[in-house]
């Protein structure tokens, strides 16, 4: 309708797996609303949910991109639950540190401090905002990375004291080549290095877009969104091995029977 690619927002689902190959659908953990005026109304956009466990509160905290149907609001949403399978209770809609926020991720550092990393300034700059101790808000301490470089879809991790951040270019639903950057300080000194992807379809990031890096059994893995703009509800994911060594980063596409 009107040339827009969208589906009604129904909420966020949770899937669980022991091997990242076979997945169990745990159902909707945060549901959209039919109530007019609700920040979670089905006519709005909810994307890229990320969940961290807070040891102090013993709560699971979700942050996500929350927007109007035309992507002009550019806010974040926050929700909290006792279990990763929910149900999550909506806490607030916000504009972190009074900046617009679109593609975003969460990162928990080795010291337990957590950060919201989000594309801002109409996708021209990535911002890095420290969260409060309970992870339910930003604490006012923030910085930026890659100003005027138009990077989005951040996925960040740390290895051997060095931060790595994988990002995407801004081409809407269409795939593009990824770039990664490194820094010894999460708030400053970020330097773009190059495309980490190798092999066939590397320049299109294997027709995906970075969304998160996680660690399992001492190895890092990159999760990609695979958008289907003609039928967004049929979009999927892939999980790929990441090799990080002394400031160099390599991602390869391969089939796995287990991780």
What are these regions (language model features)?
Residues 1-259:
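Carbohydrate-active catalytic/glycan-binding domains of CAZyme proteins
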């Amino acid at each position: 309708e009107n040339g827009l690619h969208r589906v009604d927002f129904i909420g966020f689902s949770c899937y669980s797996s022991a091997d990242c190959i076979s997945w169990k659908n745990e159902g909707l953990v945060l549901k959209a609303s039919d109530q007019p005026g609700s920040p979670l109304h089905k006519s709005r956009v909810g994307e890229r949910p990320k969940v961290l466990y807070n040891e102090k509160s013993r709560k699971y905290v979700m942050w996500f991109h929350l927007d109007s149907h035309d992507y002009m609001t550019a806010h974040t949403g926050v929700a909290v639950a006792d279990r990763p399978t929910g149900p999550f209770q909506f806490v607030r809609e916000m504009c972190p540190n009074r900046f617009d926020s679109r593609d975003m991720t969460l990162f928990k550092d080795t010291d337990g401090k957590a950060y919201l990393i989000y594309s801002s300034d109409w996708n021209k700059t990535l911002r890095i905002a420290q969260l409060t101790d309970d992870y339910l808000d930003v604490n006012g301490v923030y910085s930026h990375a890659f100003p005027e470089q138009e990077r989005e879809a951040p996925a960040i991790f740390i290895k051997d004291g060095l931060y790595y951040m994988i990002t995407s270019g801004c081409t809407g639903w269409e795939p593009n080549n990824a770039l990664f950057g490194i820094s010894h300080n999460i708030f400053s000194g970020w330097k773009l290095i190059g495309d980490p992807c190798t092999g066939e379809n590397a320049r299109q990031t294997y027709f995906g877009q970075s969304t998160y890096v996680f660690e399992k059994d001492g190895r890092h893995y990159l999760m990609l969104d695979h958008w289907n703009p003609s039928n967004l509800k049929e979009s999927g994911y892939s999980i790929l091995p990441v090799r990080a060594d002394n400031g160099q980063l390599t991602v390869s596409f391969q089939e796995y029977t287990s991780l």
